[in-house]
């Protein structure tokens, strides 16, 4: 939101406070989208916050407090003025640059977000002092680290405290990437080397024959390939706090989540002579899954072009167009017909975790959108390993975090330690375009702007022919294309030019 910034006198501020709501005339064209403002009286920081309810053109017949007597252009209606903790000019930006000096008037944007303001208020003065000291030294500390330092500051003493902050600053400086460093190849090396030690295996859920989860190298390949459907999609579903210890509610949710098709609870018999399909429900299976005959009838009634009859506890279905092909198609359609549950959730099991007897539901199959709509499910903790589905339901930032978490977890389960920043770089590259793209010829590598880089990866002839037809120009800005033509790459020392400046000749 745009804010109006201006420099004023204590006399004018006192006049505004006395006459609230006050009309204030200025020699500046104020935009109509301004809703608040900040006033400085010392040219160093803003000490007053102003609520503006309206902006209109100046008219001489309006009685208003004036900042200057000549060249008046706008009248601001000021509803409220409050004194605030001094705000630095550095918290405002004008035209993409940080505000450094206050002229007469400026329209600027405040950089502090609501979230930062909300959580920043909860910090103690000691923690805030540590954060400020760190910023003064040129680096930023996480709040958790600042809290630990503030807690032990008295124990260490002031001299040790300053030395520790100095050492932290030096360590952070050492960890920063060097200018023009080839971060991509280092990330590839750092992930690829441990990746060679990963096993090709699938994890099996103990005691549940149908449930498997792909881990190791196959899972890592799935992640970087951005597979639309993972080989073993699964969900971890948490219930709301009021339900997660209630056994009856948990079992009810499990049964409502599982996708129950007709083939799960009934035998399907095809009579070629009579051209009919008979559905014979199994009483034990229907009781276990809380299925009534009425539920099966309702599911079958959704099929068009059939005649349905119920006879002695079984359902007889006949296609209106009598043919063997129609009969076969009808049989296959009935097998996969959903009676109840959520589509895509093939299996669900509940497990007790932790000392507090809290239930967590694990599923084979995934359908994040529909699961989050179940009343008892906690949408803030429920998770799926289907990254593309996360992108479709929760957005690209959630998908970026999912790529990072899934890759990190896959490596850690194999006992491999990879710096998270390498994985963050991969996640950023896969999602920066706004959609999840694979690391391969169909994704990042196949969509590079360089013709030679695309051709060097895969399908060389196609890329070169298409580039020739379209008249593409390669500016040789990347790594692969410069290596191909035998030029130094524009990274590291190849990114800068060295100019020799000799010493001037001295007169003898």
UniProtKB/Swiss-Prot annotation:
The keyword rRNA-binding does not apply. It is an enzyme of class 2 (transferase). GO terms for molecular function: DNA binding; DNA-directed RNA polymerase activity. Residues 124-508 are annotated as: DNA-directed RNA polymerase subunit Rpo1C. It is found in: Cytoplasm. Pfam families: RNA_pol_Rpb1_5. It comes from the Archaea. One of its GO terms (cellular component) is DNA-directed RNA polymerase complex. Keywords: Cytoplasm, DNA-binding, DNA-directed RNA polymerase, Nucleotidyltransferase, Transcription, Transferase. This is DNA-directed RNA polymerase subunit Rpo1C. It comes from Thermoplasma acidophilum (strain ATCC 25905 / DSM 1728 / JCM 9062 / NBRC 15155 / AMRC-C165).
